[in-house]
Design a protein with these regions (language model features):
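N-terminal secretory signal peptides and thylakoid transit peptides that target proteins
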Residues: 2-22
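Cleavable N-terminal signal peptides
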Residues: 21-23, 33-34
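N-terminal capping segments
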Residues: 39-109, 114-119
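...with weaker cross-activation on analogous glycine-rich loops/strands in unrelated enzymes
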Residues: 2, 50-61, 113, 121-188
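Glycine-rich catalytic cores of cysteine/serine-nucleophile enzymes that process amide/ester linkages
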Residues: 29, 34, 72-106, 124, ...
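Low-complexity, Gly/Ser/Thr/Pro-rich intrinsically disordered linker/tail segments
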Residues: 196-208
Length: 208
């Protein structure tokens, strides 16, 4: 097929099209080259691992938390868990009735003994006596408390009479007295009753 010769008007259109195409192509290329690279993702922050001391303390607090709701039993508790209590002078009685001899549970030092023995796999074995537990442990400043540390209490001019376990976040887990259940006390060292009798915190030492 024969095509008619190009007219002057058709020639002008071709020239204009070529000129426009030449101007657009570099602009498209420049835009592609200068596109911003996506921002780099920050490296994930890994939580700091607990020290062996912190890890043991957390296990102690976990064992203590699992005992919440277990009855108080005067003389109750050993390294195997809750045990039958007994009555001794004024201890173990409620309203003149001996509950200790019929209650399986923990008293305050029995709870501390069990939690530390269980959590440490037997590496920490405390006596079943608050004063002995105090002397078997190292002092800890209030600002340095870790879960599992022992909190001791006494009245003015009297020996130590109570021990509880620091649970972290200002709380203590303890076995208080006959007729009660093991419980968690929030803000314990800010409560007048407990703050007024606070005799210091201690951290048990491994055997050996």
């Amino acid at each position: 097929m024969l095509f008619p010769p190009p007219t002057p008007e058709l020639g002008r259109r071709r020239v204009l099209g070529l000129a426009l195409g030449a101007g657009v192509a570099p602009a498209l290329g420049a835009g592609t080259a200068s596109a911003a690279a996506p921002p780099a993702r920050p490296a994930p922050v890994r939580p700091r691992a607990d020290s062996p001391e912190q890890a043991l303390g957390r296990r102690v607090a976990t064992v203590a938390t699992a005992q919440i709701g277990v009855p108080y039993a005067w003389g109750g508790g050993d390294r195997l868990g809750p045990s039958l209590g007994f009555c001794d002078e004024e201890n173990g009685y409620l309203d003149g009735r001996c509950l200790g001899e019929s209650t399986v549970g923990f008293d305050c030092s029995g709870l501390a003994l069990y939690c530390w023995y269980r959590a440490s796999g037997g590496a920490v074995e405390l006596a079943h006596y608050t004063v002995a537990q105090y002397h078997r442990s190292a002092p800890v400043a209030r600002a340095d408390l870790l879960p599992g540390d022992l909190l001791f209490f006494s009245r003015p001019g009297a020996p130590l009479h109570h021990v509880g376990l620091w649970a972290g976040d200002g709380a203590m887990i303890h076995a208080e007295r006959t007729g009660t259940l093991i419980a968690r006390v929030e803000g314990v060292l800010d409560l007048p009753r407990w703050a007024g009798e606070f005799a210091g915190a201690r951290r048990p030492l491994p055997v050996g």
